[in-house]
Amino acid sequence: MFVRVGMVVALVAATLCGSPVQSVRLLDHAALLGDVPDQAWYEENIPFVDVPDTAIRDTYYYRWRTFKEALKYTGPADGWIVSEFLGPVGYSAPYGGIDAAAGHHLYEGRWLHDQRYLDDYLDYWLTGSGSGPKPATEDLNRNTTDWAHQYSFWAVDAAVARAEVSGDWRFLTDRLPALRKQYEGWKATNFDAAKGLYWQTPVWDAMEFTASSYQSDDPYHGGDGYRPTINAYQYGDARALALLERKAGDGSAAARYDGEATKLRTATEKALWDGSFYKHVTRAGQKIADREEIGFIPWYFHLPPASDAVAWQQLTDPQGFSASYGPTTTERRSPWFMHDALAGCCRWDGPSWPFATSQTLAALANQLLDYPAQSYASADDYTNLLHTYAVTQRKGGQPYVAEAHHPDEDRWIYDSAGHSEDYNHSTYVDLVLSGLLGIRPQANDTVRIAPLAPAAWSRFAVENVAYHGHDLAVYWDRDGTAYGKGVGFRVLVDGVEKVRRATPGDVTVAMPPAVVVARPELVDDAANVGETGYPTASASYTWHGDSAANAIDGQDFHLDVPSTRWTSYGSPHSSDWLAVDFGAATMVSDVRVDFYDDGGGVRTPDAFALQMMDPDGTWRDVPGQTRDPAAPWRRTVSRILVDPPVTTDRLRIVASRNDGGAVGITALQSWRQPDPRVSVSFVEPSLAVDPGRAVTVHTRVTGTTAAATLSVPRGWTFRAIAANTWQVTVPADADPSAGLPIRALVRTPRGVNSALLPTSYQFDPADYPTVVWNDDFTTDRLASYRVDHPAAEPSPRLAVSGGVLTASADSRAFAVLAAPVSGTAVVVSPASFSGAAPEDSLFLGLSGGDHDNAMVWYNNHFGTSGADVQTSGASHPEATGGCCAAVKWTPGDRFAVLSRWGKLTTWIEHDGSWTLLHTAPVTAAVPPATLASWSPAVGLRLDSGTLSVDRFTVLAQ
């Protein structure tokens, strides 16, 4: 809920107090970063590392780039989240959150200077949209009912690991109730009290097909068992909760969680340890013979006793997990090794999986640094495996991470175009910092430095580490030639040398008390991650592979595929514009533009204008601009401060190149700083509006004596009728289905607060009092209809009897009955469906004959609703509104379609209430006059059996 500090920075004062000033700089940051976009962000946010192993080093900076790409701003409610995929998937929580790798995200992101990214992200899972209700379905985990428990998730442990770096324990102790709830949630769904163990289905460990699940009757969603994963996760979370309870002063609660952890550790050791490895145990109590890489996870949480170290000999065993691009996810000696692994995703029975490699390396670092010495694994094993992991992350010689890699061949095997690129499902940065370079964060005012780097290395360095709010740096320079600041191993805090040794070693350094300074919340009023409602984006010209909406989707990265950009590639214009419509006016003071430059057909503009639209519809340059940089610069974000701020409902960037070539934008943002003391909201959660009518809205303001002002969409009017009470009038020619918002603004010397009230149209048949056709099928009027055939399919047998129209068929049949009238709304009451598959569908809408129609549909078999539009027999998907809305008809429900404002809107009535299902922008393909000439119609399509309706009504205003 803040602006990305390196994009360039919002409010200079906020930047200075928000992160420690780097006191030592011996590394060439620009050279290390290379040609990465938005270098200022990295300077403000990441530790800089130098090591002799260039594969490890280059992958380190690449993985910071992929992490930055995964940062997604969702809006003022949830702020920032960390995404797994760069594009959306159908099984995610709101805005694309997936908790499977959220623990990895928290460990990786804990090294960021700006804490607000992970503050928001933790709140998203603990109390925000990520903690919200989830369908308990087979596809989304039938055992759990909220998104934060969709997949196994070591939430509390990761939150504490992050606080060990930031030093901000108050943030977590303030959230103890939510953290307890997250931990306890697994007890309610996945705990076997009789055995004292947690069970999980491998797929909900993010492991679809495994050696475990293949030994069940359902290799994909089967294989329930007591697994090293969730039991170790819950052990780690219990220990973390105990620490937090002690921080909060509740020793009794701490002892309770410590006790639960001890019992779980004992039960896990007894049931899952076979004397040499931790294994999956079926619900029936059978320990599988196969070793899986998940058997190393207990060390990630310090669960095993020292005597279990023998397991680590499997990591380097050629018949165990060793591989050229490993480790493997199942031991080679298993008969399930690589079973079907090359047949398609997602087989975790041998492929090299970054998710698991991350856990194994973190676990190995713990074994090496936090347990007694043993003979099964060494620091060299750690460095060798980290190097292997680094070189695995390559494609075509360039840094790259996807979903899974072949263990023995230099190729990614689960790597779908537009889906798997820069897959954020693992850690790497944390493994370099906390393992290789040995920065071991602590819960007290110390830091432990215990590098695992090879003794043969003559140098390594890390600087610009934000640790407990201080600047931490570590340098090793054997002969003093690498960094020019002397010989030996040094640790510096805030520029002061705290340790100097002849060689690297395991040292604990006292730290000054942690410094936690909150940075101000900032809100991007231009962001619309869901691409529904407002704000909206438009452009003078858009290349067919891009989208104006991409520039305001809350993401900012410069990949070719997938993309989050708008470009004017192919435009005939000498300059092009990208505009944002806020729906209702807001204050504009801080605009950021990230221009896209692919080094080819799309380049950084030579000049651009920032313009606002006046009330009369004319565009003019925004006054009072100060730009940084003064002119556009390749791969550098342009920041425009506007002083004094302006209030407008529309902004645009007009960009041009001297050679007339194409331009592009990956992010257009308008940041606003709220006053943290103030709250403004609407009493109404939403507002139904209708053209030509007035409605009343109420605002609520707390924390200030300042009054709210109202902003309404263009053409709408309002007047105050009492304190915090407003009458809003919608013009007669307005489109209420557009979802335009009403905005309340409160201005104080410390910021501007805003609240949005979405408006919508609510269908009510009573608003269409003229009944132009009403067939209740008490008499046979079939001869009055025109029968159309939108598809080359025969008509079903049609009959009217007993107040019901029945369509019967033995095979696929389809007919549309067009009424001899015109109207605005069509209402149909189904009586029954056939139960056939896949076609068991009702259609309603407008028909102009066999080859011309705009019909919405409900498919009873699939429980979905959508629209079809065709003219002259040609389909027009651009006019259908996409597919599909999920809905299930029950007896007594009615369907309606409304043809107004150039759209077909589909509605269902259930228990007397009408709900919008779908919107089709039909006039994108059918001219309004043509649409008006078509006839209201009802269609019936089925594969067999009978489908019936008991009323067909056409209404007009």
Task: Report residues per predicted region.
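Acidic/polar, glycine-enriched structural segments that form the non-catalytic walls/loops
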Residues: 20-95, 164, 169-171, 176-188, ...
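Aromatic-rich carbohydrate-recognition surfaces in CAZymes
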Residues: 35, 95-207, 227-235, 288, ...
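Extended glycan-interaction surfaces of carbohydrate-active proteins
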Residues: 57-94, 112-145, 188-226, 266-352, ...
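Non-catalytic carbohydrate-binding regions of carbohydrate-active enzymes
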Residues: 248-282, 310-469
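Aromatic, loop-rich ligand-recognition surfaces of beta-strand-rich domains
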Residues: 560-621, 636-677
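Secretory/extracellular carbohydrate-interaction modules
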Residues: 807-866
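Short, aromatic/His-centered strand-loop micro-motif at the edge of beta-sheets
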Residues: 871-896
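Ligand-recognition surfaces built from glycine- and aromatic
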Residues: 924-957
